[in-house]
């Protein structure tokens, strides 16, 4: 099993407080060839290694470059392209609702990952300015209506979003819409003012 993590933009406009890419600001969208080319270049680094999974979890917000990302999804999945099964391709988003709807309309079973990172609007709004435009309740509703496997992504921030009450609330949100959970250790590089949750916790 080999997962390739690819980017959709240079920088990011969303300014999530814990993200080094967000601190860079947004430069531009990547083209179809630039996005698909990442998969090609990674494969060429070690030709015997073939990608079994692709995740749009690198730099940028994929659903804010939907026109290019949608084309790349076709290239990745097509037998004449990379021939990777749709269920092995995951698009990650902070919750850009029009893009989630568009992804859900595709006939292929592409996976969706939602960057939640807080179980309440108050805390999520502090960490993720995009929560003003796309509130948590609307994002959760979109997950419930997606009709395919959805994963909640949750970066663990020491003393910020990792208390027992956060876990209880998060578990309820995930259970109510049948989502999987992916708890992510914080990479300290670039996340000024935050510390990782201790591994034991």
Locations of regions flagged by a protein language model:
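Conserved AdoMet/S-adenosylmethionine-binding subsite of the radical SAM
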Residues: 43-200
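Alpha-helical scaffold elements adjacent to nucleotide-binding pockets in ATP/GTP-utilizing enzyme cores
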Residues: 34, 38, 71-72
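N-terminal [4Fe-4S]-dependent radical SAM core
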Residues: 1-8, 39-49
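Canonical Radical SAM [4Fe-4S] cluster-binding loop centered on the CxxxCxxC motif
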Residues: 2-33
């Amino acid at each position: 099993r080999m997962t390739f993590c690819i980017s959709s933009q240079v920088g990011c406009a969303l300014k999530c407080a814990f993200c080094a890419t967000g601190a860079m600001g947004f430069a531009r969208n990547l083209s179809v060839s630039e996005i698909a080319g990442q998969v090609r270049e990674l494969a060429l680094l070690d030709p015997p290694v073939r990608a079994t999974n692709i995740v749009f979890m690198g730099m940028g917000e994929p659903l804010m470059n939907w026109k290019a990302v949608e084309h790349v999804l076709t290239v990745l999945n097509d037998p004449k392209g990379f021939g990777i099964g749709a269920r092995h391709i995951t698009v990650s988003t902070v919750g850009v609702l029009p893009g989630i709807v568009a992804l859900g309309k595709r006939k292929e079973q592409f996976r969706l990952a939602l960057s939640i990172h807080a179980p309440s609007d108050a805390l999520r709004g502090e960490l993720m300015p995009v929560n003003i435009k796309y509130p948590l309740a609307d994002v959760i509703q979109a997950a419930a209506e997606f009709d395919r496997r959805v994963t909640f992504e949750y970066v663990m921030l020491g003393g910020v979003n990792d208390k027992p009450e956060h876990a209880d609330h998060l578990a309820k949100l995930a259970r109510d819409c049948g989502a999987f959970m992916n708890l992510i250790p914080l990479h300290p590089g670039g996340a000024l003012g935050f510390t990782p949750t201790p591994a034991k916790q």
